[in-house]
Design a protein with these regions (language model features):
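Short secondary-structure boundary segments
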Residues: 36, 110-111, 141
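Acidic, proline/glycine-rich short linear motifs
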Residues: 36-65, 144-152
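General small-molecule cofactor/ligand-binding pocket signal
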Residues: 33-35, 82-86, 137
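Structural beta-alpha unit
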Residues: 72-106, 144-152
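Short, well-ordered secondary-structure micro-motifs
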Residues: 16-17, 44-47, 95-96, 118-120, ...
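Intrinsically disordered or low-complexity boundary/linker segments at protein termini
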Residues: 1-18, 131-152
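Small/aliphatic-rich secondary-structure junction motif
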Residues: 1-50, 79
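Glycine-rich, Arg-bearing micro-motifs that act as flexible, cationic patches
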Residues: 108-130, 145-149
């Protein structure tokens, strides 16, 4: 089994990593792919020189920062992982990456946006939950949150 865990450096994303590490610690046999999705390169071009090498370095550095805490959790737990830094629309990039890496499941954090904000802004976790062909677990964050919401 291969599990994709998209992270953005936020606490809800780290909760998803902790959830997967707990499952692995309880005997689940799976490999782990940590991934982060960066803004499309054209957004960086507005504030940086139009140099492909510079843009690639900036995207990589920002992505590495987003992955750092998740990687530290995996290392502390003695769990090996693969890492991916991609750019584009967050939900679509997660869906594309899950397919490209032949992932069997996606585990991701929920932002906990209210219904109004979610309707106005859209929700990466909601879109992935609806569109992914594989099971998706959305790990809730915060006091009183249920352990996880699963579709699949």
């Amino acid at each position: 089994m291969k599990i994709l865990v998209p992270v953005d450096g936020s606490e809800p994303a780290l909760e998803a990593v902790r959830h997967v590490l707990g499952l692995l610690g309880n005997g689940l046999k799976a490999s782990l792919v940590l991934a982060t999705v960066q803004e499309p390169v054209y957004l960086y071009e507005r504030v940086l020189p139009p140099d492909a090498d510079v843009l690639e370095r900036v995207t990589g550095a920002v992505g590495a920062r987003a992955l750092a805490d998740a990687e530290a959790l995996c290392k502390a737990a003695g769990v090996s992982y693969e890492r991916e830094i991609v750019s584009g629309d967050a939900a679509q990039a997660v869906l594309d990456l899950a397919g490209a890496r032949s992932c069997d499941a996606i585990v991701m954090g929920a932002r906990g946006l209210g219904a109004v904000k979610s309707a106005l802004l859209g929700s990466v976790s909601h879109r992935v939950l609806q569109d992914a062909p594989m099971p998706v677990t959305v790990v809730k964050h915060g006091p009183g949150a249920a352990d996880a919401e699963v579709r699949g």
